A protein has these predicted regions:
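A short glycine-rich, His/Asp/Glu-containing loop-to-beta-strand
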Residues: 1-28, 84-86
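Double-stranded beta-helix
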Residues: 10-14, 70-96
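Hydrophobic/aromatic beta-strand elements that line small-molecule binding cavities or substrate pockets
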Residues: 16-18, 59, 69
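Short, conserved beta-strand element in jelly-roll/cupin
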Residues: 17-22, 30-46
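Short beta-strand His + acidic residue motifs that chelate non-heme Fe in jelly-roll/DSBH
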Residues: 26-28, 46-47, 63, 69-75
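A generic "binding-loop/recognition-motif" signal
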Residues: 32, 51, 67-68, 77
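Short acidic-glycine-tyrosine-enriched beta hairpin
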Residues: 50-65
Length: 96
């Protein structure tokens, strides 16, 4: 995480960035609050119980609160994205 209440006292939101190498995927997570992200490089998909949704560089993503999701890099270059939450730290998150 780049911006949290620890790095910017008084902040009400948080900001971070992630890099996913080709062929990698996160585990399924669900956040207590919504998440927004912007894809700076690469291509991949958000995987949910409803199925995959592809994304590529230049696209913005919105993940509603409580939605189980994973991020997968389906391309041949790193996926780089910035993400944010309306929470002063990384929000309460469940994993499965």
């Amino acid at each position: 995480m780049v911006l949290t209440r620890e790095t910017a006292p008084g902040i009400a939101s948080s900001l971070g960035y992630s890099v996913f190498t080709p062929g990698t995927a996160t585990g399924m997570v669900s956040h207590e609050v919504e998440e927004v992200a912007f894809v700076l490089a690469g291509q991949g998909e958000i995987r949910t119980d409803a199925g995959p949704a592809p994304f590529r560089a230049g696209q913005a993503l919105h993940i509603p609160p409580g939605l189980w999701h994973a991020v997968a890099n389906t391309g041949d270059e790193d996926v780089v994205m910035i993400f944010g939450f309306p929470h002063p730290d990384y929000p309460p998150t469940e994993r499965r």
